[in-house]
Regions:
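Amphipathic alpha-helical and helix-coil boundary elements used as assembly
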Residues: 1-500
């Protein structure tokens, strides 16, 4: 890239007369990038509300002239491909100031995926893998098969029951990806625009032949006109000795779901000095020992991949999150190069393009940190027992479990397919004995949740309501009555004159 660049903001449907004054961009793995563009125009009355949610692209190009201009619709800036580009939609427009000569505007460009932050949903997914669920969310929002893709190196567990509860679709996708160790980043395609790429292995990192880059420490302004890294510092962090996890699955109550990783080298290894204790996790919700091992390994890899972190600055335009770059100076910490995790970009009319970045050794398996909070249900939720078609009696399975319909679930399911089998808490239980009065279709129940996890419901109580009235009216306040669905009765009277 030459010493000067031009910056272009193009719109799919509009061609305003604008000149880019400056821009800043922030992007990282497993989040949506955000590009803020400040531009000037002689037109003080641009219809900004019409620009919202419209397709747009911001480009960096080599500059021969003196001005950076917005030149209209897609592709009109130049027939040559841009040195760098972000595509997406306009999510914010502002008029910052108005003077006699010009008006200053600010536009925010984000990928289409970012729009899912504004869709809050509560719904159920059953018997699907996480990639299947993510694909279903994308399809629900009109994304086609070319707008996202999965690059998988392992098979994924079919999840019996996944609940999205008062959670944005964006957060929901992020949370599931974090739980399964899936990363995502964006590619920019001339035909398809911004494309979300999901991956789970180093073999899926983006490798660009143009990214053997020059390392010129303290070069600063003397390297203007030449792409290089100006600074690269390497931080070594302590890591835990290992990860331990445990859980309980009532379906296979005797199965041990304990799993553990050990990051110790040999007893004499100097690397042991960086180890700090162990992390213990309970409630990751694995169903089998293999699932417990996978979850523990993913948590351990999330720790190990951050043991060595590089921070740097430069002006290499082609660098982007999940791209691997090599330097002309070797670093023993990164024999296979560096994997970019996050970047901050900036440029203006008066200053050339530059960026800062963080990276990790590319030979490591990157796992996103589990930062997206899981929805938590502290109390109870009402639900109704459901049954299969033409079911005369209570619809229960061999473990005495029920199917229920939750009030927030607006999707259509086949009869009795509204939920996973849900256990009923009882006042007395043991091996083939206890107290259990079967619940019939339509009965209102109260659901509680193990550790507040919406994916782990159980019936904690049964309720009467206006459609299913209590069999003890007000004037029977001395009677204790057990009455079954078929009108079998056991009545005990507590009036003092009738009791001993």
């Amino acid at each position: 890239m030459t010493a000067r660049q031009s910056y272009h903001l193009t719109f799919a449907r509009f061609s305003p007369s604008l000149s880019v004054r400056s821009f800043s961009a922030s992007e990282a793995v497993n989040t949506a990038y955000r590009v803020e563009i400040t531009a000037t125009s002689t037109d003080s009355s641009l219809p900004l509300s019409s620009y919202l949610n419209q397709r747009a692209a911001f480009e960096i190009r080599p500059q021969e002239g003196l001005l950076s201009e917005v030149v209209g619709v897609f592709g009109s800036a130049s027939d040559d491909p841009p040195a760098k580009q972000w595509q997406g939609i306009i999510t914010s427009c502002e008029k910052l100031s108005v003077s006699k000569d010009e008006t200053v505007y600010r536009f925010v460009l984000e990928p289409r995926f970012a729009a899912l932050k504004h869709f809050q949903s509560s719904r159920l997914f059953q018997n699907q893998t996480v990639p299947d669920i993510v694909a279903a969310v994308f399809k629900h929002h009109g994304f086609s098969g070319v707008d996202y893709r999965f690059q998988k190196s392992r098979s994924y567990t079919v999840r019996e029951y996944v609940t999205q509860y008062l959670e944005s679709d964006f957060d929901f996708v992020n949370r599931l990806c974090e739980e399964e160790g899936i990363w995502y980043a964006f590619e920019q395609h001339e035909q398809h625009g911004d494309v979300v790429v999901f991956g789970d292995s180093p073999e899926h990192y983006f490798r660009d032949p143009s990214l053997p880059v020059s390392y010129r420490p303290h070069a600063g302004l003397e390297s203007v006109g030449t792409e290089a890294l100006f600074n690269l510092s390497i931080r070594h962090n302590p890591v835990v000795e290992g990860i331990r996890s445990a859980d309980y699955n009532y379906r296979t109550a005797d199965t041990d779901l304990f799993a553990e990783t050990d990051n110790k080298q040999s007893e004499e290894s100097a690397d042991n000095t960086v180890l700090l204790g162990k992390q213990q996790h309970w409630g990751l919700h694995p169903k089998t020992p293999n699932e417990a091992e996978v979850q523990t390994t993913l948590l351990n890899e999330a720790v190990l991949c951050r043991q060595t972190v590089a921070n740097g600055s430069g002006n290499v335009v082609s660098m982007a999150p999940m791209k691997v770059f090599q330097t002309d100076v070797s670093f023993p910490e990164a024999s296979d190069g560096w994997l970019v995790l996050s970047m901050e970009h900036s440029g203006s009319r008066d200053t050339a393009y530059s960026h800062t970045f963080t990276a990790i050794p590319a030979q490591l398996a990157f796992r996103p940190e589990r930062t997206t909070p899981r929805p938590h249900i502290a109390g109870t939720l009402p639900a109704r027992v459901t049954a299969a078609e033409n079911c005369t009696y209570a619809y229960i399975d061999d473990m005495g479990r029920y199917r229920v319909k939750l009030p927030f679930d607006l999707d259509e399911w086949s009869p009795s397919g509204e939920s996973r089998p849900v256990r009923l808490a009882k006042p007395y239980a043991g091996p083939e004995y206890g107290i259990h009065f079967p619940l019939h279709e339509g009965t209102e129940v109260m659901l509680s949740f193990v550790q507040g996890n919406p994916d782990r419901p159980y019936i904690s109580g049964v309720m009467h309501d206006s459609a299913h009235t209590d069999h003890i009216p007000a004037d029977w306040n001395t009677r204790n009555v057990i009455r079954t669905w078929a009108n079998n009765k056991l009545r005990m009277e507590d009036i003092k004159r009738l009791t001993g």
